[in-house]
């Protein structure tokens, strides 16, 4: 049985999800072997008859919900104008998983993964219809001097691992395969900073959903069945004025962020300013909090005086991501903007759709 066939046959019990298939899938991914003993699947299928299970067709997502790693490379590129460029990118879509497996085998414990996304205009040019229901160009927010800017970007690569050499090697091979088809507009190498702190000293990603909740908040479901298992991702590159930030007393920094610096505890609502970062980036709908999955990474060049945060947020719809930016840059209410923006400037901004892993391979045939 081929890997693709197995992935599409996921046995779901009414009393819970059978997870044994994941161990087989992980084995196949590690070894690269495209066949396996079907006795496990046969056994699970027979159990489904007696335990009220249903076999459903659920696309495998890309590695959107992978744990935060120690290193990452973010590459944003534009598609070149030649017709051959589009053809090359489409064919390349089928090679991403294989290249990732090949490089990952060098350090099996390195947790190497790659997520690939496409902008609205790139999707239309590369794949046409149908298209993801909520995919559109990045929307700018804010006013002059405090703006979430939109910058060119047709293709996103988010490469993660616990070692930078794995990220570097995979990025090298992926970009080599795209030679002549794209032009890189931004590339950032991010690193884990102590106990998952941002470059400004506060823990980042504290409120990230995990497990099933992460999948619920990040992966498209029945609302757009053709693209189920996909995700929307928004990226921004922020530069920080570290001198001005470090001139603030710790207590003042905590009021800007809305959390304590050392212990990473959220300030009580009675003392947390309404324009603190945590207050304005908490999104609710119909009285319920809507989470996004952040995988931000610090980056910098101390010799050049450059210190930054690469923001990357995944969600099942662009809506909470854009609401967050509106709260930050316009303010809630308008004028009550995120105080962190007095020390941080967004210099890039793009929105992409991340197709499921299954669909990504199928797109090569369009």
PLM features: what roles do these ranges have?
Residues 41-44, 48-366:
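Long, histidine/aromatic-enriched segments associated with O2/redox biology
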Residues 10-13, 20, 49:
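Short, positively charged and aromatic/hydrophobic N-terminal segments
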Residues 6, 21, 30:
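Cationic, low-complexity basic patches in intrinsically disordered or flexible, solvent-exposed regions
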